[in-house]
C-alpha cells in the first residue's frame, strides 16, 4: 500500500485537506489500515515527513484528532486520551470486527486515518463491534468538527453526509436500473420470440413496434393495446433527462455534488448514444402501439439517429438466440408487418414495396435482419431498413397490419383507419366463391356490399360500418336466416373479403344488428305500456295516499286513546312497527285488460327475439324475467311492480315456453277404484254406514249409529261390527291411531280405522256380496280424503288388486266383523259386542284410515261377508278366536262378544282378509289405510285404501304375494282348505304362523293373516287366543276355504306386510305371531315359544317359523271351530303374553311374524323389523306402543315383524291358557309390517300404526313362555296401561278389569282387552314395563 499521507496534527489546513481527501477516500473503498488496540487503539499513519506518530501513547495531542476518534465520540474534541465508551453506538450491526480490516488495494496515497478503539471484555449480553466504514465516516466527521470549530463546519458535515447518501443510493439503485433497462430492451427487441404465432390471442400483426424510432413516444406516454390509431410525439431527451435528474435529485439534499455525478452519467449516456433510453421508451410504445400517427420528419430523424443502436441491439439479440440454438424464425413484429405489406397491394404500393425494402430489399427482409450470421450484413440491413422506414407512411402500414391481426379485428371498430382498405384489397385474392343457388335478391345485396366496400377502402373501419352499410348487412343477414347453416357460412366467408373484420366478428356484428332491430320493435310497445301505466298510476297513487292517510289517522286516534297508557301504547306501537313495515296499504297495482294486453304484446315480441337468439344461454323464463326486471318494471313507479308479477300477468303468452310440467302426486288412481267398489257394495246396504264414511273420520258416534241403522244380517256380527265401528270412531280408536303420531299427513286416525273397515267390507262384498259389511262400512268413518286418500290411492295403485276374487269368496256375518276389525260373528254378549265393536272399530279405523274410500261405501253384508271370510281364515289360521267364535258359533264365531271375542273376530277378519283375495285386499286396504294414516311409515306406502276400494285389485295384489306364499301354505294342508290358508302356510306352516306372518307381513299375506289374523292382530296374546278361535271359529275357517282359494289374500298380506314395513316402527308384528298359529298357540303356550324361536330366526325366515305354525294351523283348521273358540280365550292371554313371548320368541306367533316378513316381500324390510321386534318380545308391546307412541318403533324388536312374532309366541302360550285376545286380530293385521297390530290390542288397536309398537313395552308373563318384556321405546305409561289391560283381558275373570289406564287406548280397545281377560282366565302374564 502506498505510503499513507501523514496528518499534520497542529495545522488546521492539513486537516481540511485531509478532510477533503477523506471525502474522496470515503468514496473509494476504504484504504486506511486500522490497527486495533486492546487498549485505546490508535491507527498510526505511516510516519509522514511532518507527522509525528503518537507512539502508542494513549494521549495524543488534542489537535491530532486523527480520524480515529472512537466512533461513539462525535464530540468536537477527540477523546483520544480516553477512548470513548464502547463504540457500540456507532457500530452498525455489522459483525463484530476487531478494528483491523484488510487494507483495500493501494491507491494514490491519501492521509492515513488513525482510529482509537476501546475494546471491552465481552459479556453474555453484549460484545464490542466495529464497522469500519462507519468508523471512517465518524472519524472524518470528528476531524472536521475538531479542526473547524467555526459554524461552517456543520455545513461541510451536512454536505458530506448528503453526498455519502447520494452515492450510496446511486450505487444501490443506479446500476441496477441501467441493467434493467438493457435487459428490457433486449426482451422487447423480439416481442414475439418464443410465442406461438398461430395463437390468435397473440397479436403479432403490429410488427412495426420494433421499428418505431426511439425518438418517438406515445402522445401521453405509456402502452396501449387495441386502442386504435395511436398518437405519437417526439420523445425529448431533455424531458427524459429532467425526469432522471429529478429522480436523482430527490434523494440528495445537496444538489451540487449530485448534479456533477448526474451530469457525468448523462454525458456518458449521450456518448454511448441514447440508444438505451430511446429503445426503452420505444419499448413501452412497442407493447401497446397499434398505429403510428406521428410526424414523418421526426420519425426519419430518429430512425437515422438510432439506426446504429438498433442494428447493434439486433445483432446482440441474434447472438443470444444462436446461443440458445433457437433457429425458429424470429417472431418480431416486423415479420407481421411484412406479411401485412403484401396485403395492401393497391392501397399503398409504397407500403407494400417499402416493407420489403425495409427488410434490406431481400425476399424476406425481416429474416435476414435477425437470422443473418454476418454482423456486418446485419448492421447494414438494419440501417437500410431504418432508412426505408423513414419513407414509410406508418399510418398506412400500421393500419394494414392491424387489419390482419386477430386482436385488431376483435378490437372491432376502435381502430385502424386503413384496415378496411387493406383487408378488402388483400382478401379479394383469396375470396371464396359464393355458394350456388342463392336467391337473386341476396346476391344483389351482396353485390351492393362489394361496391360499398370499395368506396370505403380508403376510409377505415370506423367509417366502414355506416348506417347504409349496416342496412345492407342486416338485409343480407335476414335473408341468410332463411337458408341453411352451410350456405350461411359460405356467404360469411365470402363477405369477409369485403369488410374490415374477420368472419367471426362479422357474424357477431350481424347478429347484433339483427337483435337491435328486434329491440327497436320493442320500443313502440314499451312506449305504449309506459303511457298506459302513467295514465292509470295517478288514480292508484291517489287511492294509496288516501289509504295511508286513513291509516295514519286511525293510528293517531289509537295513540290518543292510549295516551294514558303511554308506555303500553308505545310498546304496542313498537310491536306494530315490524308488521307495519308496509306503513300503510300495500302498493298493489290494479291491473286492467288494456295494460295486461299491452304487456302480453310486449312479451310476445320479446319472445320472438329470444327465438332468434342462436345460442340460448338462458332459459326462456330467465330471459323474460331479466327483461321484465330491467326494461318493463321501471315503467312503474318504484315499489309498485315486481318482475314476478309481470311474469305472472303475462303467463298466457309465455306459458308454453316457461311452464314446467307440474309434478303432481298421482296417488288417487287406486283410491277412486276403492271408492267405486265401496259404492257398488254400498247399494246393498246404504245407510249410516255411508253416512259414517262421509262423516268426519274422527266422528266416534257415527259408526255406532251406522251399525244401529245398518244392523242387518248376522245381528251379532252387525252388532259387533257396530261396536267395533263405534270404538274405532271413539277416541280410543283415534288414540290408537298410529297415524296421529307417525303420519303427519293423515289427520284423522278414526277415519282411517273406518276406512279400513270399509275396505274390509268391500273385500267381503267382493267375496260374498253385500252383507254385514255394510254395517262395518257404517262404523268406518271416511277419513279426510285429502292426503290420506291420495296416499292410500298411491299405495293401492302399487298393489295388484283382485276385486272379483274378494267378491267371490263369500263371507257371512264375519264380513261385517272383519270390516269392523273382527272376523268372528257379532259377540253374543253386549259386552262382547261392545268389545268386538271396539276391536273392529280399531281395525276398521286402522284400516279405514288408509282405505278411506273403499270402506265407506261397503254394504253391511259385504262387510259381514268379509268378516266371515276373515273369521273363517282366522279360525283356520289361528284359533285365537275360537272362544268367541264358539260363543257366536255361526255368524259371529270370529266376532268375540268380549274384547277377546272382538280380538278374535279382528284376527279372524284379518285372517279372512288375508285368506280371501278379496277379503285380503279389503283387509289389507284397511291395514293400508291404517298405514296410509301413518303415511310416514312404510305401511302407508301399501295404500290400504286403494286396496279396500278395489277389493278385487287388492285380492290380486294379495294373490300375488299369496301365490308366493302359497308354496309355504302348501306345506300346511290344514290351511289348504282355504286359499288364504295355503298362503298362510306358505307364509307359515300353520294358521297361527299365518297370523304371525300377517303381523309381520300383514300386507304381503293378508290371507295368511286372514286365517291367522287374530294372532296377527294380537301378536302373542292372539296366539294364545288363536288356539281358541281355531277350535270355535274354525268354521269361519271353513268359509275361509273359499278365501283360501284366493291366493290374493295371501297377496294382500303381502300388501299388509308392505304397509307394516312402512310403519316399521309399529309393533304390529307382535300381533301377527299370535294369530299366526291359533291352534298351536292354544295347544302350546309353551309351543308358541318354539314358534317364537322360529320367528326369532330372520324375519325373512318367518315363513320357516310359520311353517310349524302353519302345520298347527291345519290342525287348528282340522280341529275346526272348537279350536278357534279355545284359542280365542288364550288369544287374549296370548296377546298379553305374546309381548313377553315375542321377546322370548317362543310362541308360534314367531311363525306369524315370519310369514309377515316373508309374506310381505314387498315390505320385507318392514317385516324384518317387525320380526326383530317380535323377537324382543314386542308383541303386546307393539300393541301398547302404538297407543303410547305411534311414531316410535319398537325398540326391543328390530322390526315390527319381530315384535309380532314375539307377541305371537307369548300369545301362543296365552292362547292355551286365556281367552283369545283378538284386539289386534284383523285390525292388527295391518298391511304394513310396521303397522303390525298390537298383539294385545287385537281388533281394538288398529293395525294402522305409523310406528312399530315395541312389544318390549308390554311385559306379559306367558303360560308356556314367560313373556319377555323387551325394553319398549314407547312410553312406559302406555306400555303399563296396555299390559295391564291385556293381562286383565287375558284373564278370564277380568273382562272389564282391564281398563287401559292411558288415554292412548280407546275405550273400545280397553273393553276388548277386558273381554279378552274375561274369556281368558289363564292369563298369567305379569305386566312388564318395557
Swiss-Prot record:
A GO biological process held by the record: chromatin organization
One GO CC annotation: nucleus
Residues modified to N6-acetyllysine: 1052, 1132
Modified residues (Phosphoserine): 13, 236, 297, 402, 405, 408, 570, 1107
Region (Disordered), start-end ranges: 1-113, 236-304, 322-345, 559-583, 767-789, 801-835, 866-909, 964-991, 1021-1202, 1292-1330
Sites of Phosphothreonine modification: 229, 238
Low complexity: compositionally biased ranges: 866-895, 1045-1056
Composition skew (Pro residues), residue ranges: 81-96, 1030-1044
Keyword Signal: no
Family as reported in the entry's similarity comment: Belongs to the ubinuclein family.
Gene: Ubn2
Signal sequence coordinates: none
Organism whose genome encodes this protein: Rattus norvegicus
Chain intervals with Polar residues compositional bias: 767-780, 809-818, 899-909, 969-980, 1073-1148, 1158-1169, 1308-1317
Protein name: Ubinuclein-2
Amino acid at each position: 500500500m502506498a505510503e499513507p499521507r501523514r496528518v499534520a496534527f497542529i495545522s488546521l489546513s492539513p486537516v481540511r485537506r485531509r478532510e477533503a481527501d477523506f471525502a474522496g477516500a470515503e468514496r473509494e473503498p476504504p484504504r486506511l489500515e486500522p490497527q486495533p488496540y486492546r487498549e485505546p487503539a490508535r491507527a498510526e499513519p505511516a510516519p509522514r515527513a511532518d507527522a509525528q506518530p503518537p507512539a502508542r501513547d494513549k494521549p495524543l495531542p488534542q489537535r491530532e484528532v486523527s480520524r480515529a476518534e472512537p466512533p461513539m465520540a462525535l464530540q468536537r474534541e477527540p477523546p483520544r486520551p480516553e477512548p470513548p465508551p464502547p463504540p457500540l453506538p456507532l457500530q452498525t450491526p455489522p459483525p463484530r470486527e476487531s478494528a483491523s480490516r484488510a487494507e483495500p488495494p493501494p491507491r494514490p496515497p491519501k492521509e492515513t486515518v488513525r482510529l482509537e478503539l476501546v475494546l471491552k471484555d465481552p459479556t453474555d449480553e453484549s460484545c464490542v463491534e466495529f464497522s469500519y466504514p462507519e468508523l471512517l465516516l465518524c472519524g472524518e466527521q470528528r476531524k472536521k468538527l475538531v479542526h473547524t470549530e467555526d459554524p461552517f463546519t456543520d455545513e461541510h458535515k451536512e454536505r458530506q453526509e448528503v453526498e455519502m447518501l447520494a452515492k450510496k443510493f446511486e450505487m444501490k439503485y443506479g446500476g441496477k436500473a441501467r441493467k434493467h433497462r438493457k435487459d428490457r430492451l433486449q426482451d422487447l427487441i423480439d416481442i414475439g420470440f418464443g410465442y406461438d404465432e398461430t395463437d390468435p390471442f397473440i397479436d403479432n400483426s403490429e410488427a412495426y413496434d420494433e421499428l418505431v424510432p426511439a425518438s418517438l413516444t406515445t402522445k401521453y406516454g405509456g402502452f396501449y393495446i387495441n386502442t386504435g390509431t395511436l398518437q405519437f410525439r417526439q420523445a425529448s431527451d431533455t424531458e427524459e433527462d429532467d425526469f432522471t435528474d429529478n429522480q436523482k435529485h430527490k434523494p440528495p439534499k445537496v444538489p451540487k455534488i449530485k448534479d456533477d455525478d448526474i451530469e457525468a452519467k448523462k454525458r456518458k449516456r449521450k456518448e454511448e448514444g441514447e440508444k438505451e433510453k430511446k429503445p426503452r421508451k420505444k419499448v413501452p410504445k412497442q407493447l401497446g402501439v397499434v398505429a403510428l400517427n406521428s410526424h414523418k420528419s421526426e420519425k426519419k430523424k430518429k430512425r437515422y439517429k438510432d439506426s446504429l443502436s438498433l442494428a447493434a441491439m439486433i445483432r446482440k439479440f441474434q447472438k443470444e438466440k444462436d446461443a440458445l440454438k433457437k433457429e425458429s424464425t424470429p417472431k418480431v413484429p416486423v415479420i407481421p408487418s411484412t406479411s401485412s405489406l403484401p396485403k395492401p397491394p393497391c392501397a399503398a404500393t409504397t407500403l407494400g414495396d417499402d416493407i420489403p425494402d425495409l427488410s434490406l430489399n431481400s425476399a424476406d427482409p425481416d429474416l435476414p435482419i435477425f437470422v443473418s450470421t454476418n454482423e456486418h450484413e446485419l448492421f447494414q440491413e438494419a440501417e437500410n431498413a431504418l432508412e426505408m422506414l423513414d419513407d414509410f407512411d406508418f399510418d398506412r402500414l400500421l393500419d394494414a397490419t392491424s387489419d390482419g391481426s386477430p386482436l385488431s379485428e376483435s378490437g372491432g371498430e376502435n381502430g385502424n383507419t386503413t384496415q378496411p382498405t387493406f383487408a378488402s384489397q388483400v382478401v379479394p385474392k383469396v375470396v371464396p366463391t359464393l355458394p350456388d343457388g342463392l336467391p337473386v335478391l341476396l346476391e344483389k345485396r351482396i353485390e351492393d356490399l362489394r361496391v360499398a366496400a370499395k368506396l370505403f377502402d380508403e376510409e377505415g373501419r370506423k367509417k366502414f360500418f355506416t348506417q347504409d352499410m349496416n342496412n345492407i348487412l342486416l338485409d343480407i343477414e335476414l335473408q341468410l336466416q332463411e337458408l341453411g347453416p352451410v350456405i350461411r357460412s359460405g356467404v360469411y366467408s365470402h363477405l369477409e373479403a369485403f369488410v374490415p373484420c374477420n368472419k367471426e366478428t362479422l357474424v357477431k356484428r350481424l347478429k347484433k344488428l339483427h337483435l337491435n332491430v328486434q329491440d327497436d320493435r320493442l320500443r313502440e310497445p314499451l312506449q305504449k305500456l309506459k303511457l298506459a301505466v302513467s295514465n292509470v298510476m295517478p288514480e292508484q297513487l291517489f287511492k294509496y295516499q288516501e289509504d295511508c292517510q286513513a291509516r295514519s289517522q286511525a293510528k293517531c286516534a289509537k295513540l290518543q286513546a292510549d295516551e294514558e297508557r303511554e308506555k303500553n301504547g308505545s310498546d304496542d306501537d313498537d310491536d306494530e312497527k315490524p308488521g307495519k313495515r308496509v306503513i300503510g296499504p300495500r302498493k298493489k297495482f290494479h291491473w286492467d285488460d288494456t295494460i295486461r294486453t299491452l304487456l302480453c304484446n310486449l312479451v310476445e315480441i320479446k319472445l320472438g327475439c329470444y327465438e332468434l337468439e342462436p345460442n340460448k344461454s338462458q332459459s326462456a323464463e330467465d330471459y323474460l324475467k331479466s327483461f321484465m326486471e330491467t326494461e318493463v318494471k321501471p315503467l312503474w313507479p318504484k315499489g309498485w311492480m315486481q318482475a314476478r308479477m309481470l311474469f305472472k300477468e303475462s303467463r298466457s303468452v309465455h306459458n308454453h315456453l316457461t311452464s314446467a310440467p307440474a309434478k303432481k302426486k298421482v296417488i288417487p288412481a287406486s283410491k277412486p277404484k276403492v271408492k267405486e267398489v265401496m259404492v257398488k257394495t254400498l247399494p246393498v246396504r246404504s245407510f249410516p254406514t255411508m253416512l259414517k264414511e262421509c262423516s268426519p273420520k274422527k266422528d266416534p258416534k257415527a259408526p255406532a249409529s251406522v251399525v244401529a241403522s245398518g244392523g242387518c244380517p248376522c245381528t251379532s256380527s252387525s252388532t259387533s261390527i257396530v261396536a267395533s265401528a263405534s270404538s274405532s270412531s271413539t277416541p280410543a280408536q283415534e288414540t290408537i291411531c298410529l297415524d296421529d303420531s307417525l303420519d303427519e299427513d293423515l289427520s284423522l286416525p278414526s277415519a282411517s280405522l273406518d276406512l279400513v273397515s270399509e275396505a274390509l267390507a268391500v273385500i267381503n262384498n267382493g267375496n260374498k256380496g253385500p252383507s254385514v259389511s255394510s254395517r262395518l262400512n257404517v262404523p268406518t268413518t271416511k277419513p279426510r280424503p285429502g292426503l290420506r286418500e291420495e296416499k292410500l290411492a298411491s299405495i293401492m295403485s302399487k298393489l295388484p288388486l283382485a276385486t272379483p276374487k274378494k267378491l267371490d269368496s263369500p263371507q257371512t256375518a264375519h264380513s261385517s266383523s272383519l270390516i269392523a276389525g273382527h272376523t268372528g260373528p257379532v259377540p253374543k254378549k253386549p259386552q262382547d259386542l261392545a268389545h268386538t265393536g271396539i276391536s273392529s272399530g280399531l281395525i276398521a279405523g286402522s284400516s279405514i284410515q288408509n282405505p278411506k274410500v273403499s270402506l265407506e261405501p261397503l254394504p253391511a253384508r259385504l262387510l259381514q261377508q268379509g268378516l266371515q271370510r276373515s273369521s273363517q281364515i282366522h279360525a283356520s289360521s289361528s284359533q285365537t278366536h275360537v272362544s268367541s267364535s264358539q260363543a257366536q258359533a255361526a255368524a259371529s264365531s270370529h266376532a268375540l262378544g268380549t274384547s277377546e271375542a272382538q280380538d278374535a273376530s279382528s284376527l279372524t277378519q284379518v285372517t279372512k282378509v288375508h285368506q280371501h283375495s278379496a277379503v285380503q285386499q279389503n283387509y289389507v286396504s284397511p291395514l293400508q289405510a291404517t298405514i296410509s294414516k301413518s303415511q310416514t311409515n312404510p305401511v302407508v306406502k301399501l295404500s290400504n285404501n286403494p286396496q279396500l276400494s278395489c277389493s278385487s285389485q287388492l285380492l290380486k295384489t294379495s294373490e300375488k304375494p299369496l301365490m308366493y306364499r302359497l308354496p309355504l301354505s302348501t306345506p300346511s294342508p290344514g290351511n289348504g282348505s282355504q286359499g288364504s290358508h295355503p298362503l298362510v302356510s306358505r307364509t307359515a306352516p300353520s294358521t297361527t304362523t299365518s297370523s304371525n306372518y300377517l303381523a309381520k307381513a300383514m300386507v304381503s299375506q293378508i290371507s295368511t293373516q286372514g286365517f291367522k289374523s287374530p294372532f296377527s292382530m294380537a301378536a302373542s296374546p292372539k296366539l294364545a287366543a288363536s288356539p281358541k278361535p281355531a277350535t270355535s271359529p274354525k268354521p269361519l275357517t271353513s268359509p275361509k276355504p273359499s278365501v283360501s282359494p284366493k291366493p290374493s289374500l295371501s297377496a294382500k298380506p303381502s300388501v299388509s306386510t308392505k304397509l307394516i314395513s312402512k310403519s316399521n316402527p309399529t309393533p304390529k308384528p307382535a300381533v301377527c305371531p299370535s294369530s299366526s298359529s291359533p291352534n298351536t298357540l292354544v295347544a302350546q303356550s309353551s309351543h308358541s315359544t318354539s314358534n317364537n324361536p322360529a320367528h326369532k330366526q330372520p324375519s325373512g325366515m318367518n315363513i320357516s317359523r310359520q311353517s310349524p305354525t302353519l302345520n298347527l294351523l291345519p290342525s287348528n283348521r282340522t280341529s275346526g271351530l272348537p279350536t278357534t273358540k279355545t284359542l280365542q280365550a288364550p288369544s287374549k292371554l296370548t296377546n298379553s303374553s305374546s309381548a313377553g313371548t315375542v321377546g322370548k320368541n317362543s310362541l308360534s306367533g314367531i311363525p306369524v311374524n315370519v310369514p309377515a316378513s316373508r309374506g310381505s316381500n314387498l315390505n320385507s324390510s318392514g317385516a324384518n323389523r317387525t320380526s326383530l321386534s317380535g323377537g324382543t318380545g314386542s308383541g303386546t308391546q307393539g300393541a301398547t306402543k302404538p297407543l303410547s307412541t305411534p311414531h316410535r318403533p319398537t325398540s326391543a324388536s328390530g322390526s315390527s315383524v319381530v315384535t309380532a312374532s314375539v307377541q305371537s309366541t307369548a300369545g301362543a302360550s296365552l292362547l292355551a291358557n286365556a281367552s283369545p285376545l283378538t284386539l289386534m286380530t284383523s285390525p292388527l293385521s295391518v298391511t304394513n309390517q310396521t303397522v303390525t297390530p298390537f298383539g294385545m290390542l287385537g281388533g281394538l288397536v288398529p293395525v294402522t300404526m305409523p310406528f312399530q309398537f315395541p312389544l318390549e313395552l308390554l311385559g306379559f308373563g306367558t303360560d308356556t313362555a314367560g313373556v319377555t318384556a323387551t325394553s319398549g321405546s314407547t312410553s312406559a305409561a302406555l306400555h303399563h296401561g296396555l299390559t295391564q289391560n291385556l293381562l286383565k283381558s287375558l284373564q278370564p275373570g277380568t273382562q272389564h278389569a282391564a281398563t287401559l289406564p292411558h288415554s292412548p287406548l280407546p275405550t273400545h280397545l280397553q273393553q276388548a282387552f277386558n273381554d279378552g281377560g274375561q274369556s281368558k282366565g289363564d292369563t298369567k302374564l305379569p305386566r312388564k314395563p318395557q
